[in-house]
């Protein structure tokens, strides 16, 4: 069996990265930004300032990553003739962003607001019904085109979310090791690469 690693096309991390968003997206004229109501006032003004040369449409997430929500956002993307979809928020916002990018055939940029989710880098969206019960996994052909992590945003998130992210980073090493030594199949239907295992080691080392 072959070995394969999946990763975003570009990963960028640093303090005040939201201020650089205009440079990251300078090749696009029309942009849709998906975020939640509780994050709108916190982040949209910064993003609007950074994207002042672009035409931006803000879409407020309606509480669930469901097919009806994905279709609603996709319709807005198509109606505004937007060229790229940006997701700002937690796991469900980012999963919705990834699914919309897939169905609308548009590049996506994800900006996580907490360390407690794997959604930013994965090639997977977890889809629910509108009543919040599980529907299905949507396996995507690739990870996001860009992941932008503003460390100031992550640091300002609720402490419980940072703790959860640290715990997840710590446990990833043991999960990766079990898969690596047993030659188990990963979500890409291949075996774990040495580089992926090395990243999991670095994750553990950074939080110990």
Outline where the language-model segments fall.
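Alpha-helical scaffold segments in soluble metabolic enzymes
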Residues: 20-24, 46, 72, 99, ...
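Short glycine/serine/threonine-rich phosphate/pyrophosphate-binding segments
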Residues: 40-44, 92-98, 117-121
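ATP/NTP phosphate-donor binding region
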Residues: 1-84
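A glycine/threonine-rich phosphate-anchoring loop and its flanking beta-alpha core
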Residues: 104-202
């Amino acid at each position: 069996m072959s070995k394969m690693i999946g990763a975003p096309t570009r990963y960028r991390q640093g303090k005040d990265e939201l201020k650089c968003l205009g440079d990251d997206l300078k090749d696009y004229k029309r942009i849709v930004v998906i975020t939640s109501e509780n994050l709108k006032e916190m982040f949209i003004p910064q993003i609007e300032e950074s994207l002042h040369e672009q035409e931006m449409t803000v879409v407020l997430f309606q509480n669930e990553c469901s097919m009806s929500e994905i279709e609603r956002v996709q319709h807005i993307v198509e109606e505004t003739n937007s060229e790229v979809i940006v997701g700002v928020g937690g796991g469900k916002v980012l999963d919705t962003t990834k699914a919309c990018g897939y169905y609308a055939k548009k590049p996506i940029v994800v900006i996580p607001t907490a360390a407690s989710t794997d959604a930013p880098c994965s090639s997977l969206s977890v889809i629910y019904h509108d009543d919040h019960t599980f529907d299905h996994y949507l396996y995507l052909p690739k990870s996001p085109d860009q992941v932008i992590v503003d460390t100031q945003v992550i640091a300002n998130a609720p402490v419980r979310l940072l703790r959860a992210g640290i715990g997840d980073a710590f446990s990833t090493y043991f999960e990766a090791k079990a898969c690596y030594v047993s030659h188990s199949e990963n979500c890409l239907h291949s075996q774990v690469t040495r580089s992926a295992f090395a990243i999991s080691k670095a994750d553990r080392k950074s939080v110990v």
